[in-house]
Amino acid sequence: VTRASNTFRALRHPNFRLWFVGQTISLIGSWMQTMAQQVLVYRLTGSAAALGMVNFVALIPLIPFSLWGGSLVDRLPKRRVLIVVQWLMLIQAALLGGLAWAGLVKVWHVYLLSFLLGAVNAVDLPARQAFTTDMVEGKEDLTNAIGLNSAMFNAARAIGPALAGLVVAAVG
């Protein structure tokens, strides 16, 4: 068995492969949204402090709600939890996008919606991690799946803001 095939062996599981691709797209979009929110706040205020505040506000709910989110994921069907949180993220993004598109967005809207997104992420992140283990039949590829999932998360963290920067540069 070659080294490359060992590196990606969890992708031989169809459910994990589909999950991996879908999660890659979703996370790149999430990181693009984070960058877009930062650009929006800076354009609204011209303030570096306000820019820092939007990131802080998004992180506030992660600490207390992550404990609850992990417990919730352990008690409910993970797939259903993920579907609900993805819909909530879509609604949050649509609200923010709609306000910005209509020219009605205020900084407090961005702060509030960032806080709500942080609360949803507190459930989404443990659900994603737990669901990954369900996508690999048998446990011989589980460590590989977890490693690929982690690498993909970090790649999305790099690619998403870079793509958002290109979009902002092109569209304005």
Show the residue positions of the predicted features.
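Alpha-helical transmembrane-bundle signature of multi-pass membrane transport and export proteins
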Residues: V1-G172
